């Protein structure tokens, strides 16, 4: 299974109301990025990242440039598994974890689909019967 196309959508998400954060910061619109990795086998892997630059050490408008920089290392490579492709990307572009995270999610999605297993199984399996939230 090899990735033969990368598509990235950038979308502004506007809240119905202003969101109030710590330190008096507010946010009413954030930019999110949705990535699709198409493969020669017909499978698609999806990822999404929504960096909020005034809250996190990330720059949303830098994601498309980072994906363009990393694309040659992604397209054409065997993508069965996640660790080796992500290590390869570290050699192409240092840092930029927010931009790499969208690729990481899409690779995990592909890995799960290709292996026919749920993502939680690939990440170590179910460890509890239920999960209390609060």
Predicted regions and their residues:
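N-terminal amphipathic alpha-helix/helix-capping segment at the start of soluble metabolic enzymes
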Residues: 1-13, 87-91, 113, 117-130
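Structured beta-strand/loop patches that form or line metal/cofactor-binding pockets in enzymes
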Residues: 1-46, 50-57
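Metal- or metallocofactor-binding catalytic centers and their adjacent structured scaffolds
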Residues: 5, 38-114
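Short capping/connector residues at structural and topological boundaries
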Residues: 16, 24, 79, 124-128
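Generic marker of residues within folded, mature protein domains
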Residues: 25-27, 93, 123
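Broad gene-expression machinery/nucleic-acid interaction feature
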Residues: 32-34, 102, 130-132
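Hydrophobic faces of well-ordered beta-strands that scaffold small-molecule active sites
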Residues: 45-47, 129-134
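Acidic/polar active-site rim loop that often engages polyanionic ligands
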Residues: 66-68, 128-131
């Amino acid at each position: 299974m090899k990735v033969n196309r990368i598509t990235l959508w950038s979308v502004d998400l506007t809240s119905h109301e202003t969101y109030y954060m710590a330190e008096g910061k507010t946010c009413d619109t954030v930019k999110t990025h949705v990535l699709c990795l198409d493969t020669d086998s017909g499978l698609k892997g999806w990822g999404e990242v929504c960096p909020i630059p005034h809250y996190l050490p990330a720059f949303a408008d830098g994601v498309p440039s980072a994906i363009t920089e990393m694309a040659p290392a992604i397209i054409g490579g065997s993508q069965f598994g996640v660790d080796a492709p992500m290590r390869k990307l570290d050699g192409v572009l240092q840092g930029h974890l927010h931009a790499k995270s969208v690729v990481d999610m899409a690779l995990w999605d592909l890995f799960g689909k290709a292996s026919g297993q749920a993502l939680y199984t690939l990440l170590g399996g179910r460890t509890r019967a239920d999960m209390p939230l609060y």
